[in-house]
């Protein structure tokens, strides 16, 4: 499923993205971890906020990427809609730290937080939107009206950059299965 309508629209509380497809439930190795995101516009502040519902979270390896990716997506959607980013609320059903990540987690807790970096987004603006309608294909039902900003179509990784990012040395960890 995809974003249902323009975030600048007055009824924008219906903006949702779902990672769960019942048709895939029997063939997927695992159900999706982050299953739902909903965006909401505060029209007084002209701000777009996001709430993410996550079924399961690997706190050390997965959660930081989940938070960063939904924050970036919210920034991008706000940009193409002429809004400012609002808040990100993240609800986790089952948060877990695997035994093989405990030492790295202790090291993270010992570290003093660095200043938050800025985010630079280029080549993304609010210059038009294209509607894409997903329909029944004979096997799967996906009737969702997706709003795809034209300016997203040529989006490349180098169009987004962290500014003044001063990280601690990297910590690694093996994926737990």
Enumerate the predicted regions with their spans.
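Terminal, non-catalytic protein-protein interaction segments that mediate quaternary/complex assembly
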Residues: 1-177
């Amino acid at each position: 499923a995809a974003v249902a309508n323009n975030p600048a629209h007055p009824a924008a509380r219906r903006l949702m993205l779902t990672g769960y497809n019942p048709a895939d439930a029997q063939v997927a190795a695992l159900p999706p971890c982050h299953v739902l995101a909903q965006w909401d516009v505060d029209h007084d502040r002209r701000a777009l906020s996001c709430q993410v519902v996550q079924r399961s979270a690997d706190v050390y390896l997965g959660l930081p990427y989940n938070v960063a990716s939904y924050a970036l997506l919210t920034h991008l959607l706000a940009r193409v809609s002429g809004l400012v980013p609002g808040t990100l609320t993240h609800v986790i059903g089952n948060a877990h730290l695997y035994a093989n990540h405990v030492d790295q987690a202790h090291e993270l807790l010992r570290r003093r937080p660095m200043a938050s970096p800025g985010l630079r987004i280029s080549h993304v603006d609010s210059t038009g939107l294209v509607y894409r309608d997903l329909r029944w294909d004979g096997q799967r039902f996906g009737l969702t009206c997706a709003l795809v900003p034209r300016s997203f179509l040529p989006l490349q990784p180098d169009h987004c950059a962290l500014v003044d990012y001063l990280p601690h040395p990297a910590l690694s960890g093996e994926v737990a299965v």
